[in-house]
Amino acid sequence: MDPQPPPPAQGSPPHRDRGRGRGRGRGRGRGRGRGRGGAGAPRAPLPCPTCGRLFRFPYYLSRHRLSHSGLRPHACPLCPKAFRRPAHLSRHLRGHGPQPPLRCAACPRTFPEPAQLRRHLAQEHAGSEVDLSTQRAVKEEPEASWGPQDEGVEQPATVVVAGAEEEATTQWPAGDSAPAAVPTSTDPRESEAKEAEAGAAELRAELALAAGRQEEKQVLLQADWTLLCLRCREAFATKGELKAHPCLRPEGEQEGEGGPPPRPKRHQCSICLKAFARPWSLSRHRLVHSTDRPFVCPDCGLAFRLASYLRQHRRVHGPLSLLAPLPGAGKKDDKASGGRNSGKGPEGGEGAECGGASEGGEGGHNGGDATPARPPAGEPRFWCPECGKGFRRRAHLRQHGVTHSGARPFQCVRCQREFKRLADLARHAQVHAGGPAPHPCPRCPRRFSRAYSLLRHQRCHRAELERAELERAAALQELQTQASQSPQPPQPLKQEAEGLPLPIAHIKEEPPSPGTPPQSPPAPPVFLSASCFDSQDHSAFEMEDEEMDSKAHLCGLGGLAS
């Protein structure tokens, strides 16, 4: 017989209950020890003064404060992207072509990412007893302490352990002992102070680096309206060619080094000869040369080329104007744009109602799976951190951000005046342009170089226009009163004045003289049929009147009627 286990002692719970009770007791005791302020007591959270987010360590708080500064001092040398932290930049650089791979110690396979290597070790070599350390195939530069007197001595190799992605251990040659480890302090207060000091130093360094980066003048608008690159002294006719110029790209992003090559521009406009890489871009560009603006705002009367422009404009009038449907909402607008904006958010698409109204007319308040409500239209959603000015679109905020930077890279070649935007420089160049101004006033001989200057000038003629309108209304009223007071003399019929035969309806019957036999009624004209009299249809007489009037008119023009 199998030996049975001894019964539990009297008064003691079974094994399972005893284990559970022990676990619960340990957990409660450990928690009580922490709460009493022992060595493992929780630290007070550190709030961010800008957004109120809580952090456990000062270093994390100092690193988080970089996100509110908007600075990205670590720029990628291969593309225009920039990052706030060096770790993010190093992780981004792995996607730019071949990087030194990680070799597996158990097989000849290599992996570009440490996470992929760890996954490979867990799946392929989980049950085998192999050295799970892997070595990265990187040619490390010798340190400063490794001088020429140490030639022929084996140098240490940097080995990446599979269990940690960022940590590295140093293997020293056999027979040599590793340098003695520096004793580290175990006081948590000293470690917190060091972390806070390191975070503050990193923050100051990044702020100083970002403040020292100043943009220098790169582009000059010449007298012949060409854009001159000040680095290589090459001129360009359009802004697009200037942007594609290698000198204005970030360092390292030259042809064949970083990023895909630019797409060739095969679609050219036949009017202005501007080229585009995609056909829908050319179709959308052709609307610039068209004067047709079929989409009219029902609130202010402004007209637009595309329905998406009208929807964007109607946000200015507030949320009530967005409830009314657009004119021609059932049509699929922006056909020229190739449907790029169709059905993708409030900037484009077929629907015209606010809030994603359905075709059934239920509107955007049908509940259920409705999208979350957007902020009220007409109110700013993006605020400038420098001056507090609000904008409705993020693009407007980016354009406004140029005003707070001291860089003025665009300079006028005639008066040496500097500007922050290329559009401001082009508008200023109209001052030096020869010939008359392109915007004349229809009321006076003055001309203006800018359209908004003409609109501002036309306010001077507002009183003159109102006076002319009052005079015109008074003259019209006087003519109406004169016409009502003086009776008009009876005018002879047009047929009598021109000597044409009168129609039958206008012939007056003379009474017969006494003694004359009664005459039979005259025969009907040839063009009439018996059916006209039977059905009492008098349209034939009206047709005859119209024919006679047209013949008389042709006779008056020179006898063209045959």
Swiss-Prot record:
Q: Is the keyword Repeat assigned to this protein?
A: yes
Show the Pfam families listed in the entry: zf-C2H2
Q: Which GO terms describe its cellular component?
A: nucleus
Using the record's annotations, give every residue carrying the modification Omega-N-methylarginine: 94
Residue ranges of the C2H2-type zinc fingers?
46-68, 74-96, 102-125, 267-289, 295-317, 382-404, 410-432, 439-461
Q: Where is the composition biased (Gly residues)?
A: 340-367
What InterPro entries does this protein's entry cite?
A: Znf_C2H2_sf (IPR036236), Znf_C2H2_type (IPR013087)
Task: Give the UniProt keywords, A-Z.
Answer: DNA-binding, Metal-binding, Methylation, Nucleus, Phosphoprotein, Repeat, Transcription, Transcription regulation, Zinc, Zinc-finger
Basic residues bias: where? 17-35
GO MF term set: DNA-binding transcription factor activity, RNA polymerase II-specific; transcription cis-regulatory region binding; zinc ion binding
Q: What is its main location?
A: nucleus
**SMART domains given for it?**
ZnF_C2H2
At which residues is Phosphoserine found?
191, 486
Q: Where is the composition biased (Pro residues)?
A: 1-11, 512-525
Q: Where in the cell is it found?
A: Nucleus
- Write out the biased-composition intervals (Basic and acidic residues): 187-197
| Region ranges (Disordered) | 1-45, 120-154, 166-199, 321-377, 505-530
Q: Which family does it belong to?
A: Belongs to the krueppel C2H2-type zinc-finger protein family.
Protein function: May be involved in transcriptional regulation.
> In its UniProt entry, what is this protein called?
Zinc finger protein 579
Which species is this record about? Mus musculus
Its gene?
Znf579
